[in-house]
A protein has these predicted regions:
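Fe(II)/2-oxoglutarate
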Residues: 1-44, 255-267
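Short, contiguous, helix-prone interaction/anchoring segments in small proteins
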Residues: 42-48, 52-56
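Hydrophobic residues positioned within well-ordered beta-strands of beta-sheet architectures
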Residues: 51, 159-161, 232-234
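Short loop segments at secondary-structure junctions
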Residues: 53-54, 165-169, 241-242
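Signature of the catalytic double-stranded beta-helix
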Residues: 53-74, 87-135
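Catalytic core of non-heme Fe(II) oxygenases with the double-stranded beta-helix
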Residues: 118-210, 216-217
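Catalytic core of Fe(II)/2-oxoglutarate
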Residues: 174-175, 184-267
Length: 267
């Protein structure tokens, strides 16, 4: 039996069909050519760059409402460690791609907006593509309990762009940390070695901000939540041209977010 497709609670004011146009107008005004050149230079140096005010406020409110509703109905809490990333923890609530595809039209249209690919390509300095593995197109995650964290890890595909919907003050944790120019050896992962070999940088973000990461060679994490902070994000995976011809595995994504498996459909 196929899962029903439900309307988004957020589409009353912002229609899914208008997402691409809203983003194109906003990004042209917020990030003109000179600004994008500065972002590209920073990304070339740090392999991560923050994008303050990336999402226009009306769209942010609508996407946040949509994601919060989806999380309330479908979020699954995980408390795991992954040997493949040197036993780092994942303590978080998640919703995977199949549910969002059907019940999150704003998130879906945000990811597939051509302007998103063009913008990220300007920042990273090469063409980018939507992920060939549907399970990594977009996922929603939330940290909202003391100690919740998305621990140190790398990703298979080269790039990620993360849209921040809710964020605690940095004093409550939930900020991003990144270690560029590191290598993920899945057979012998070495988080401490990576921490010793390169500089750790930390980035605080606010709702509506986004950040782009070179995720396959930048070890990164979300600092554990302290107290009652709450962080909700949409993580979107983008592929380099080289990624399209490279064999990939999806161990951590499938364990945390379910990959392409639809949890609404019984076995």
């Amino acid at each position: 039996m196929e899962a029903p497709i439900l309307p988004s609670v957020a589409t009353a004011e912002v229609q899914p069909s208008s997402v691409a146009e809203l983003m194109a107008t906003h990004l042209a005004e917020k990030f003109p050519a000179a600004s994008r050149a500065e972002l590209a230079a920073r990304f070339a140096d740090e392999h991560i760059v923050t994008l303050p005010g990336f999402c226009p406020p009306p769209l942010l409110a609508a996407v946040r409402d949509e994601a919060v509703d989806i999380m309330a109905r479908h979020g699954t809490y995980h408390d795991l460690t992954f040997e493949i990333t040197d036993n780092t923890p994942r303590r978080m609530r998640t919703v995977g791609q199949p549910v969002i595809r059907d019940e999150g039209p704003l998130v879906h249209n945000f990811y597939f907006a051509p302007v998103l690919l063009d913008f990220v390509a300007d920042v990273v300095g090469e063409p980018v593509h939507t992920c060939p593995y549907a399970g990594e197109h977009y996922v929603i995650s939330r940290l909202d309990a003391n100690g919740d964290t998305h621990g140190w890890h790398w990703d298979d595909y080269t790039y990620g762009i993360i849209l921040v919907l809710e964020a605690p003050h940095y004093t409550e944790g939930g900020f991003v940390q990144a270690v560029p120019n590191t290598h993920w050896d899945k057979g012998n992962p070495d988080v401490y070695g990576a921490l010793l070999s390169s500089q750790v940088r930390s980035y605080a973000l606010e709702p509506g901000d986004a950040y782009v990461v070179k995720t396959n060679t930048t070890m990164h994490r979300v600092h554990p939540i302290r107290g009652e902070g709450r962080r909700t994000i949409v993580n979107m995976t983008l592929a380099s041209t080289a990624d399209l011809d490279r064999p990939m595995t999806h161990e951590t994504n499938d364990a945390l977010f379910g990959g392409v498996r639809d949890p609404r459909i019984g076995s």
